[in-house]
Amino acid sequence: MVTKKEFLEDLTNATNEMIKAGDKNGDNQLSKKELYELFKKCKYPNPTLVTNSLLELFDLDKDGKLSVNEVKTALLVDYIIEAETCLKKFVDSIFKADSNKDNKITWDEARQFFVTSGSNEAQAKVFANSMFEDVDSDDDKCITREELREYAIEYYEIYPTE
């Protein structure tokens, strides 16, 4: 997954390029007319539809203009939703190890999960030790959903809650 920083940099650059290409009055925004002219110049099949769709999606203050911040804000919401969905799937997949369904994974549950997943006993112990070393942030010998979520955010460099 792309980091939030990379996502915002790419998005900002692309939006700035689009605004630069179509901004006729130099206000660093694209009016409805400027958007229409830009898409007409690029030979979009239906520039009116594209213009109206973009304004509907991204013109958050409904002033009839698009700014870089409006596009970033609108898309960041989608990014956060996707990141949260991926995090939930990741945590849920690991929490299959929680055999007694108490919302905590013990070392024994982790070891057994790795055995059930095809590891031999020695490998399962190594994997369980590694998992607890990396994820059990409060050293209470249990892994919670929140610890696993925080680990995933750091490990995969995604920051959906910032």
Swiss-Prot record:
Q: Does the keyword Nucleotide-binding apply?
A: no
Q: Please provide the record's keywords in A-Z order.
A: Calcium, Metal-binding, Repeat
* Membrane-traversing stretches: none
Classification via InterPro entries: EF-hand-dom_pair, EF_Hand_1_Ca_BS, EF_hand_dom
What top-level branch of life does the organism fall under? Eukaryota
Q: Where does Ca(2+) 2 bind?
A: D59, D61, D63, K65, E70
> SUPFAM superfamilies from the entry?
EF-hand
An annotated GO cellular component? nucleolus
Task: Tell me which Gene3D superfamilies the record gives.
Answer: EF-hand (1.10.238.10)
Pfam families listed in its UniProt record = EF-hand_5 (PF13202), EF-hand_8 (PF13833)
Instruction: Spell out the molecular function terms from Gene Ontology.
Output: calcium ion binding
Boundaries of every EF-hand domain copy:
10-45, 46-81, 85-120, 123-158
- Annotated Ca(2+) 1 binding sites: D23, N25, D27, Q29, E34
| Keyword hit for Transcription | no
Which residues take part in binding Ca(2+) 3?
D136, D138, D140, C142, E147
Summarize the subunit comment.
Interacts with numA/nucleomorphin in the presence of Ca(2+).
This protein is called Calcium-binding protein 4a
Q: Which organism is it from?
A: Dictyostelium discoideum (Social amoeba)
Q: Which gene encodes it?
A: cbpD1
